[in-house]
Amino acid sequence: MTLHNLKPATIMSDTLLNEQDYLDLQVLWYLYQFSPDYVQGEYDASHYDQGLIDLFMQPGQYTHADLMYVVDRQHDHMANVLPMYSELAASGQVELTTTPYYHPIMPLLMMDGWTMEDGIRVNKESWPEDVQNHLITGMDLFEDKLGFRPTGMWPSEEAVSPAMVEPVSDVGIQWMVTDEEILMKSTDLDGNMIDVDIASNLATPWLVTGADGGEVATVFRDRVISDRIAFQYGTMTPEAAVSDFIAYLDNIRQELLDAGEDPSEHLLTVALDGENWMFMSEFQHQDNARPF
């Protein structure tokens, strides 16, 4: 496939782009949201698309019809995504989770005010009904599009607090994921601070109980290995990245064995935001990280 570089001489210069340049940029912007391997039919459920392949090979000078062709193909492919998700969930291959509808920071909604670092006071009441509305709206949309109601949740920005446990539990969310730093700042039932450097603590789901008895199982992601996938492995060869990943897991497993624990009774959580995948696309340009 052709790697396009639109008028490199214009970068950091006073040269103006013309209408054709902007049209080329539009087409390339949408075109490169497709994987070249996908449009060549090399992925499961993908089909060979000669029209897109021709546009990949064309060195600019695109037309408005070309732009519409690419956008229409995007719509066609996106229409297949949710049905495929539903199929995978129905077969038990994956579990799909929801997130609050408008990406609210739920702990802030639950707080009755706070003082910012510059000393400015934010005065507000606690808004648990807002939290529930975001959750229910997100779950309703999920059910409408996928055909079933989720029981797991990714909190916006992984932000959690004791106060939000009740509204989350009340809407039927059974489990959620957040960061190991939250666990590090938490206490067990005996009031002891939890040491996340102990493998059996981090690689274990915890049952979090709210003030009124609501319960939500919570897994705390291993930040080290999650961040390696998000930010480091994209600069390594697939072989080196996989070797590092497996070695890390083996070390956790050995720590559990040394502590007299059964590794099969533990769960190590790797969690990262979807937009971090951009860091995975540099695997020596090998098939958008598929070898990994």
Model regions and ranges:
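N-terminal catalytic cores of secreted or lumenal carbohydrate-active enzymes
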Residues: 1-118
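The substrate-binding groove and active-site-proximal loops of carbohydrate-active enzymes
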Residues: 1-2, 7-14, 50-76, 119-132, ...
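Alpha-helical packing segments of well-folded alpha/beta enzyme cores
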Residues: 77-88, 130-142, 160, 164, ...
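CE4/NodB-like, metal-dependent polysaccharide N-deacetylase domain
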Residues: 120-157, 250-271
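Active-site-adjacent pocket scaffolds in enzyme catalytic domains
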Residues: 156-292
